[in-house]
Amino acid sequence: MKLRRFRLEELQKATDNFSHDFLIGHGSFANVYRGTFPVEGTLAIKKPHSEAYTSTEDFRNEVRLLSKVKHENLVALVGFCEETGKKGPKAAKILVYEYVANGSLLDYIIGKGGRSLTWRERVKIAIGAAKGIGHLHEGIRPSIIHRDLKPSNILVGEGFEAKVSDFGLVRTGPVGDESHVTSKVKGTLGYLDPAYCSTFHLTPFTDVYSFGVILLQLLTARPALDSTRAANSTSHIINWARLSIEKGKIGDILDTNLLVQGCNMEMMVKMGEIALRCVVKVPKERPTMSQVRQELEAALKAADDEDLPPPPPAASMGDGDDDQRKSGRIHRSSDSVVSVDGIGLERFHVELDSVSFQSVSLRCLETSISMD
């Protein structure tokens, strides 16, 4: 779709001259406003701060770069506005994007009074965001590094599909194993890759680190940096969560909403393990975004396979069933993961000889079977 060039007057009218009442997002790079147009409907209008672009050519390069970004998990650029106006050459350099009505991931995991995401919705959002970021890294040439990934920049679309937004800090990625050296570190505290901060070398793994932090937030619903622990080594979510994940005690750090609703613990453990691999100190030892996406998809498929209903019981026990009766069988029920008083349980159906009984076993206990 060809980009539309908007007039400044149109944008001012759609936002009541960029009124605070139309403000839907703000950051160090720009403010974002909601505007409604006769033909296009509701759009998101990103008005950068005056110092955002050093030149008109800088802005045009940004538009050309963003016009290449076409993916279902990336917020699409619809058009732009470039006018000199009355206040000099920086007066109107504005980007116009599609509008995503369901807010950002930050609204759901840190909370603005809305409903909590289910474990499956969290995984689905993580997979969608990984697809979008992976497309930036590998799906276009030259590649693009976002370098400001955080929950407020992951929007939630229809059916809880993730849409990565805010490409105000994007930079053309390096070629091959090279890195792009920047003159100034940009991003958000808590999500900034320490390797990038210390070396100024920007690579796709810079985004992978930020994504690892987001995965931890999806699990825990905690901020990346906890101001109440400012003088404590656990003020960062990575340090706070690491030991519990490494010991397999994911329940100690999970969002309590997940424990109350019930969740697939294996999936949560896997997400935590992937998150820790994303934030290892050496960038090249981190997985790529494509690998992250593939592992999340594989873990979700395994969780779905667990939930498949058992095969129907045989009408009669013939000679061919002798070995089956002797060895016994364990089936996962269609509702294999349940929650009782906030504790994840797994339901089994066990058949031994001609005796059949139901049991529920706590995953955290060594006791294999408890009779109903």
Positions of PLM-derived features:
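Conserved catalytic-loop aspartate of Hanks-type protein kinases
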Residues: 207
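Protein kinase catalytic-loop region centered on the HRD/HxD motif
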Residues: 131-144
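Activation segment
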Residues: 199-204
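Intrinsically disordered, low-complexity cytosolic regulatory tails
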Residues: 1, 88, 93, 261-274, ...
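Membrane-proximal cytoplasmic juxtamembrane segment of single-pass receptors
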Residues: 1-96, 102-106, 110-123, 129, ...
